[in-house]
């Protein structure tokens, strides 16, 4: 129980062992003496089990063995009773409150290390932070020891000279030891409920006091040397604090006060609700409606936050303040993918704004194509990943943090530029930050995620950029370290084009059927591996690579090209292939032929019209194969002239913004 330091387990000793050590004859003497006193109505103290004072009044004719039998039992009971009273008198405040203010059971156990914080509180910071509160000072305290609770009493009295007790000790039972982070965030759950109904582990609810609290104060554990953001005790305490705060009646909004080295859960206690921070002290005044909605969510990804079958619920927000967004940084090869993604969103029936973040490396020509597809251009300054090597693929992917600066929107559905929206997903705007599908382990996939733009969240991400380690070196890993309390949406809303090594034939068949289903069953199809527009349309070129073959499927490949063909003709040019890419495709095909890959895709004759279209100065791509891999000179932009921007109808577009 939080607020419940160690208490020794009582050991009850009976007289059974003593009786076994007595001889039968002595036992008989004692029994006869006991019956004689009972019949004679003599000294009644002989049969009173708790009469442990007047030893001298015992019958002097009794055998010493009788004294041994009964008086030792009495002595042991006296010791037990004394120990119990001592424990009650000197126990932590949590027990006194439990005994006097609730029917909670006594909990004889050591403090759970998951809830323990060794932080020395800076009471000067506490006092100065409390100056931001004008309301009364009835304080609910959680997870403090008895000395700290006494200090809270002193703090409350320093502002109020009344005699009324201003501190209420809150009780919270610990979560069971088997409630681990992996149990709360399993890698897989049976979303379709084919064999079982996913159920989250039970976490004890806090008992909400009947008395109104102006301030809820909580001491949070933070083990900086470990995986502090994935801590069951830390999560449990914050959910308990949110529960008490959300229980306020009427229009009253209390404050929540954390003492912790580490920042609270940013999508539970939002930085926009942060009133003050001093050192390890955090004071919030949360929006209670928002808090109540979030408390209706499952405690982890162990259950779907948006069950299958109820995806048609409308968003309650303002559609003009909701948008789809993606980002391109230094990667013109994804322009075609972003254009196709925009086309798929419009085909799904959504009319929400489309916002794309680009940096200065995206040319005016490519910007014109994006605008023609419906994207509103926002120019950004790139953010370098400080842990990435120069020119590495992940060098600039922290630029994704700029999404939180889109504060002219309340909700953003971020989508990667390599996916298609097959069915309308506007209902996801009703979901909180961060809502996403599972990836591996306890992590979410950031390819589709709901976020709530806020400048202070952006600042939070930037403040820890040198401190937080990304598991994969990229933005997805970083965001998973910050937003550990994420909410699972069905995998059909970000279905990966991928056949796992462990997939059996039946699983592969089901996936293939999903890829090609008409009308679509999947909401979003996410193209991993070599992208469709970088292959010829004749077949999925992932088949020609032993590295990428797990991403190969002609069915999903054709699905993408159907969307491409529905795009305005003027946008097709943004999907043309450079000569170097044609050389790469031929190189992979020859490798597959040499290895005699059984699928036989390397035998298919290419009929894609783009095969004969040259957009650079290196049209003889076959000559490149003679020197393949020798140098990188074919990447020079001088070999790829930039065409003039196409004409765009801007009547339906908003002015661009810079971030």
Swiss-Prot record:
Residues 1-20 are annotated as: Disordered. Mn(2+) binds at residues 416, 418, 526. Pfam families: Glyco_transf_8 (PF01501). GO terms for cellular component: Golgi apparatus; Golgi membrane. Gene3D superfamilies: Spore Coat Polysaccharide Biosynthesis Protein SpsA, Chain A (3.90.550.10). It is a single-pass type II membrane protein. Disulfide bonds: none annotated. Belongs to the glycosyltransferase 8 family. Glycogenin subfamily. PANTHER family: GLYCOGENIN SUBFAMILY MEMBER (PTHR11183). This is UDP-glucuronate:xylan alpha-glucuronosyltransferase 1. It comes from Arabidopsis thaliana (Mouse-ear cress).
